[in-house]
């Protein structure tokens, strides 16, 4: 008996690429004017090279909310944070930008993919879960 594939059944890298292209094709996400000049955190020295980085981050965040609900802006700042290089001084962990995470979560809310959770953070909606599972079903699984 063949069952439908979910987000958990496919490779994370393949899913994020496929869902990012789906978000770009749908045209429901409005790119802010600052996407080409903003850094993704104070730990970064330059803005992202990939012009579609905003769609990739949105797809990754939607996948993370799908797999583990209750994630808010602070959790995403920790997830996408990293090591800040301080020159000759030792490196330390630094959080990523909260404005980017907040803006993407608000965009996903307007698309009805995520919603506010009463316990805090965001959770996936039923239509969002169906949308993500449809994209996952289109991805071919390598044996």
UniProtKB/Swiss-Prot annotation:
GO cellular component labels: cytosol; cytosolic ribosome; cytosolic small ribosomal subunit; plant-type cell wall; plasmodesma
Record-level Gene Ontology MF annotations: mRNA binding; structural constituent of ribosome
GO biological process, one term: translation
Signal sequence annotation: none
Any Pfam family the entry gives: Ribosomal_S19e
InterPro entries: Ribosomal_eS19 (IPR001266), Ribosomal_eS19_CS (IPR018277), WH-like_DNA-bd_sf (IPR036388), WH_DNA-bd_sf (IPR036390)
Keyword Cytoplasm: no
Keyword tags: Ribonucleoprotein, Ribosomal protein
Family in the record: Belongs to the eukaryotic ribosomal protein eS19 family.
Entry protein name: Small ribosomal subunit protein eS19z
């Amino acid at each position: 008996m063949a069952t439908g594939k979910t987000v958990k059944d496919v490779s994370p890298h393949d899913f994020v690429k496929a869902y990012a292209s789906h978000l770009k094709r749908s045209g429901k996400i409005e790119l802010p004017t600052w996407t080409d000049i903003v850094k993704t955190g104070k730990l970064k020295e330059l803005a992202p090279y990939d012009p579609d980085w905003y769609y990739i981050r949105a797809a990754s965040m939607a996948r993370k909310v799908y797999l583990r609900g209750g994630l808010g802006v602070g959790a995403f700042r920790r997830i996408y944070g990293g090591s800040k290089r301080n020159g000759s001084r030792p490196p330390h962990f630094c959080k990523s930008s909260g404005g980017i995470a907040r803006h993407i979560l608000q965009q996903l809310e307007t698309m009805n993919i995520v919603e506010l959770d009463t316990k805090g953070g965001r959770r996936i909606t039923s239509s969002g879960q169906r949308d993500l599972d449809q994209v996952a079903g289109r991805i071919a699984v390598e044996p």
